[in-house]
Structures are given as structure tokens and as C-alpha cells.
Amino acid sequence: MNTTKEKQMIKHVEGTRYGRFYDIGDGIYVPSVTTVTRYGCPTPNYLLKYIVNNSKGDYDKYLETNSEALRVGTAVHDNCEKLLLGEDLLIENDPEVQKGVISFCKWYQDYLPKVIAIEEVLYCKNHKRGKLIHPFAGRCDLVAEMNDETWMIDLKTSKSLEDYTYVIQLSMYKMLWDARHPERPIDRLALVHCKKNFMGAQPTARTKLFKEVKFDEKSVKSAVRFFYRYQEAFDSKGNLKTKAKLQTEFKL
């Protein structure tokens, strides 16, 4: 778990037009895990097709849809965290959020995980040859023990769990966790589907709410390498570091 000093040090997250950056102390800024996967991984064709079809080519409509999905996802995550911390909840008149939490509760009751950490901010300041070993940071949803094994679990409200960036995100969290907690490394990785669009009052028995994924360090390194190659042209605020000096005075 993060200490009070660590929470004070890493609570500042700088937002830029190119994602979020964590201040992990000593003047070091690193991109968030989701920022790396967003800009360091290609967008799958099926997702591009969904974006275009759903927005009908209207960028403002896409932003509206994306904002609502983000609101629902954030609300589901926040409420699941409260439940794990022992709070009782009352959620009314918000069907997608209610269904997302219902799905989470069903998974929890089926698997009965023993909570180890909730929403822990993960980062690593270890260097090798003058460079950070893991030049990224992030907040993992849940680390829990199940069947005498340590699982790292990410909650997702998206319609599908097939996006491979989810595997890369969990792999990045595992790398950070293992660096910070060598006494208890992560054994297995999984996604919990907080499904928000099922029919009826409860997910059916056939609804798959839990998906194990395999650690993929090679893909992490590729995403990080591409991200930093892309980011080299920008400063920490997302502005171009160098701009061409254009002629200002003209005469024939």
C-alpha cells in the first residue's frame, strides 16, 4: 500500500493534450500506463469502425459518447472501490452504473477474493544505465489472493474484453508491482467485466465476467519504445519542442 508520504508526492498528475503524466518525485515525470497504451499501440480496426459508425463521422458526437462512457466507467470503478472498502451503497436512476456494479458484485460473490491492495499507485524509480527501468506509472484497480495465488485484476466496463491493450496495461502494472513488492510478486492477471448492458435485472449464468490474460513483457517494451519515439517531439505540456522559424519579412 502507498504510504502517506508517497500519496502526497504522487497525487499530482499533470494532464496534457497527449495524456497524463505522473510526478514521481525528484523532478521525474512519467506517462500513465493508459497514456502509453493509447499513443504507443495501434487502434484496432474494429474499434475505429465502431467509433466512425457510432458517431456517424461527427467528432462532437464522438466526444459526447466518449464522455458518457468515461463517466459510467469512473462511477462504476469508484463504487466498486467503496464496496471493497466495506461501504454500503445506494445507486438509483443510473441503469448502466447500477448494472456495472451488479456485475462486479456477482463476480465477487462467485470468487470471494481476499483483498491485498485497492487502487494502489504504482511507479518505479530504479535506473539502469542512466534510464528508468520502467518509465511509466499507473493505478491498479485490485490485487487479491485467490486459491493461494496473488492476482492482479483490472475492472472494465467496455462492451468487450478483447482489446489487447488491456493485456499490455495489466502487464505494465505487474512489472511495477513486482519491482515495488518483490516479497509478493503477481502470479496471475485477469480482467473483471463490469458489464453494463445486460438484459434484465441480473447477468445470465452464461455471461462471462472473468477473463485471465497472460503476461506479455515483449509487447510492453514495444509500446513503450513507440510511445517515447512519438513523444520525443513534445515537451511535458504536449507542445512541440522545436518550431520552424518562418520568414516574416518579404520583398521581391
Each model region followed by its residue ranges:
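Residue-level detector of flexible, active-site-proximal loop/helix-junction positions
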Residues: 122, 159, 196-198
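A short local loop/turn or secondary-structure capping micro-motif enriched for an aromatic residue
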Residues: 38-40, 160-163
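Catalytic cores of nuclease domains that cleave nucleic-acid phosphodiester backbones
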Residues: 7-12, 64-152, 161-165, 180, ...
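Acidic Ser/Thr/Pro-rich low-complexity disordered segments
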Residues: 198-207
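Catalytic cores of nucleic-acid endonucleases
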Residues: 168-197
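Charged, glycine-rich intrinsically disordered N-terminal tails and low-complexity linkers that flank
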Residues: 1-75, 252
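Activation of the activation-loop gatekeeper triad in protein kinase-fold domains
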Residues: 155-156
